[in-house]
């Protein structure tokens, strides 16, 4: 099984000083969806409630209209594939219409394997005060974030 969290060690800048922190972080992992024995796609997701996520995805994409159409939904032994069997045959859509998120919520696992996400072991080469000011500026400019408390966003600075 894939754990939904992992321990990390990082440097945190707070109150004008650096400190080393041990903490837990949420994991995102590639999890494939197999429908009636055929691999359909791979999600990037936090690996919890995967059977429900898979069935919900099929409902959201209008593949199924009712839970009674699902004969079985089972997480594989390693936790990286959800196998859903429907009580009827279905064809895999050519595209996904309703899934939101970056890249439609889907990913190419081989692309992920090429990404280097390791931490830089060297001291930071940026001014933490500047980063704090930029984050504050970002939050000030995000009206929807202030209203809801959560929005994916990005910033570019020199």
Feature map (PLM): residue ranges:
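Intrinsically disordered, low-complexity regions enriched in acidic/Ser/Thr/Pro/Gln residues
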Residues: 1-157
């Amino acid at each position: 099984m894939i754990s939904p969290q992992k321990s990390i060690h990082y440097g945190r800048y707070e109150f004008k000083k650096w400190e080393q922190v041990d903490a837990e972080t949420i994991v995102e992992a590639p999890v494939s969806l197999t429908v009636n024995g055929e691999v359909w796609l791979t999600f990037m997701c936090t690996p919890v409630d995967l059977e429900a996520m898979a069935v919900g995805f099929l409902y959201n994409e209008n593949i199924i209209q009712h839970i009674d159409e699902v004969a079985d939904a089972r997480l594989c032994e390693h936790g990286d594939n959800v196998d859903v069997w429907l009580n009827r045959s279905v064809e895999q859509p050519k595209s996904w219409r309703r899934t939101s998120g970056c890249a439609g919520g889907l990913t190419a696992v081989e692309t992920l394997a090429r990404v280097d996400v390791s931490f830089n072991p060297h001291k930071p080469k940026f001014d933490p005060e500047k980063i704090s000011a930029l984050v504050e500026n970002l939050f000030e400019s995000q009206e929807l974030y202030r209203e809801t408390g959560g929005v994916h966003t990005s910033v570019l600075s020199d």
